């Protein structure tokens, strides 16, 4: 496989550059990437430390830096080394400025903006934690999204990912031969999404979990027939209620959450017409 070094340089958390890099890397199956993360680069002293690392390990540079002086120093350095230096959002900012006829603000303010979006995200994270794994079912009316599925179908991390996008998500496990949650019998306004998975894949995940916890006496948890029935029952319930179902067998948490958000916002836009 072809090795590829990528330096992610940011005056913040490098997440934007990381998402861009991973999205691009998904198009190259024969590449073995090595990502170097350089967050919170906000002055020349810190940048010079990064530049020395880039010089010792040549690779593509992806950056999100607002300060003009730092950007110039970084791009000049990479130009002299003859390595690509790409602004992840520079083109977007420029096009926004041209289209809206609004001049780009030169001054960079590193104080975080504590706006409504920020507090909505905090509230959503708090909600996801308090309503994990079927807890506090009496507060489901506050949820934007409810996830239901067998154990180990990525319900919890998906709920947290949704929360980071400002959506309150509760998740409820479906266990074969156990009473179904009351909300299944009711007509509710919230978006309910069923998560299912290939039974063989689910058994692998559950066996790994049991090994990690050093538990050897839970045969039903990894019994193929029971696992298969749990997935089939979730599908059946969702079909009866006309709830969408997502098969997470080959999907990342980000993919699953993105699909759920698309369903949620399509539904919301439909009702807001």
Swiss-Prot record:
- Ligand binding (ADP): 149-156
Q: What class of enzyme is it?
A: transferase
Q: Does the keyword Kinase apply?
A: yes
* Cysteine pairs bridged by disulfides in the record: none
- Tell me if Cytoplasm is a UniProt keyword of this record: no
> Which residues does UniProt call coiled coil?
none
Q: What domain of life is recorded for the organism?
A: Bacteria
Its recorded reaction(s) are: N(tele)-phospho-L-histidyl/L-threonyl-[pyruvate, phosphate dikinase] + ADP = N(tele)-phospho-L-histidyl/O-phospho-L-threonyl-[pyruvate, phosphate dikinase] + AMP + H(+); N(tele)-phospho-L-histidyl/O-phospho-L-threonyl-[pyruvate, phosphate dikinase] + phosphate + H(+) = N(tele)-phospho-L-histidyl/L-threonyl-[pyruvate, phosphate dikinase] + diphosphate
Q: Which GO terms describe its molecular function?
A: ADP binding; ATP binding; phosphotransferase activity, phosphate group as acceptor; protein serine/threonine kinase activity
Question: According to the UniProt entry, what is the EC number of this protein?
Answer: 2.7.11.32, 2.7.4.27
Supply the alphabetized keyword list: Kinase, Nucleotide-binding, Serine/threonine-protein kinase, Transferase
What function does the entry list? Bifunctional serine/threonine kinase and phosphorylase involved in the regulation of the pyruvate, phosphate dikinase (PPDK) by catalyzing its phosphorylation/dephosphorylation.
Family of this protein: Belongs to the pyruvate, phosphate/water dikinase regulatory protein family. PDRP subfamily.
- The protein, known as: Putative pyruvate, phosphate dikinase regulatory protein
């Amino acid at each position: 496989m072809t090795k590829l070094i990528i330096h992610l340089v940011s005056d913040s958390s490098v997440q934007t550059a990381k998402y861009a890099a991973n999205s691009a890397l998904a198009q190259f199956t024969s590449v073995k990437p090595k990502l170097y993360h350089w967050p919170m680069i906000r002055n020349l002293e810190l940048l010079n430390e990064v530049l020395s690392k880039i010089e010792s390990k040549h690779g593509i540079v992806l950056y999100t830096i607002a300060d003009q002086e730092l950007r110039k120093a970084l791009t000049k350095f990479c130009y002299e080394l003859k390595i690509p230096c790409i602004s992840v959002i520079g083109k977007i900012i420029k096009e926004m400025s041209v289209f809206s006829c609004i001049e780009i603000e030169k001054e960079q303010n590193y104080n975080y903006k504590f706006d409504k979006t920020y507090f909505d995200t905090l509230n959503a994270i708090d909600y996801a934690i308090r309503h994990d794994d079927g807890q506090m079912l009496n507060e489901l009316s506050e949820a934007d999204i409810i996830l239901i599925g067998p154990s180990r179908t990525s319900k919890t991390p998906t709920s947290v990912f949704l929360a980071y996008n400002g959506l309150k998500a509760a998740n409820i496990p479906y266990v074969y031969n156990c009473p179904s949650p009351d909300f299944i019998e009711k007509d509710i306004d919230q978006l309910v999404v069923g998560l299912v998975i290939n039974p063989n894949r689910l058994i692998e995940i559950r066996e790994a979990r049991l090994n990690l916890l050093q538990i050897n006496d839970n045969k039903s948890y990894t019994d193929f027939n029971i696992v298969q029935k749990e997935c089939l029952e979730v599908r059946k319930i969702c079909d009866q209620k006309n709830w969408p179902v997502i098969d997470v067998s080959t999907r990342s948490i980000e993919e699953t959450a993105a699909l759920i958000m698309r369903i949620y916002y399509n539904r919301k836009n439909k009702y807001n017409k």
